[in-house]
Amino acid sequence: MSSDQDHLQETDTEARFEFKKEEKSAFETEKGLTEETVRLISEDKDEPEWMRERRLRALEQYQEMPMPTDWPGQPDLSEVDIDEVVPYIRPDIETRGGAENWEDLPEEIQDTFDKLGIPEAEKNALSGVGAQYESEIVYQNMQERWEEKGVVFCDMDRAVQEHPEKVREHFMTTCVPPSDNKFAALHGAVWSGGSFVYVPEDTTVEMPVQAYFRMNSDGMGQFEHTLIIATGSGVSVPRRSEERRVWKECRL
């Protein structure tokens, strides 16, 4: 590829992603990670005590662990300054937990995801679609035929409230527990949003689900969590698309 073509490709990419919506948040924490921050996140989500305690235990593990410096094949993260990151921003929208109809979203949120290329044709070709803006899922939809078979595709915050037994059993317990490394502990303390997928026994979901994640604010960290419980005979691997501005400042 010529240098002119490289430049055109970079220009097209920047034109697509380098835009920012000037929007007010409904709630956001201060920069950095403290016990107060973790409690505020849990309180804002009206979480049960068991999830709040898990967050606080993860915070303790984070504070005790050194910054990893020798991960094979991974970039050096020793210079990452969590004290300069805002870990939680809830956008100012009326529907928490994700609107089920795209038209119910505020126009500015719709416009943001339309600019990122989420066409109706693609949404109709998927089993389910989720979209996260900052720290919250703003849209979540599952095709009715899968819901009738007992398949669950919802945001993680709703799953904590409506499927507590499943979340409590599987959330960061065996795959990647907070004790695995410092960033796993960080995630366990401040996670927000993300997708929950449950496929019951003797059920196969042939079509994929897809989740989109958008970071709009400067200096924020987005810590979405995806939990997949597939007890059925098969499920298509969920796809995810992280659309983020071409950042010129620290984000995580």
Where do the language-model regions lie?
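Glycine-rich and polybasic anion-binding loops at the starts of cofactor/ligand-binding domains
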Residues: 2-245, 251
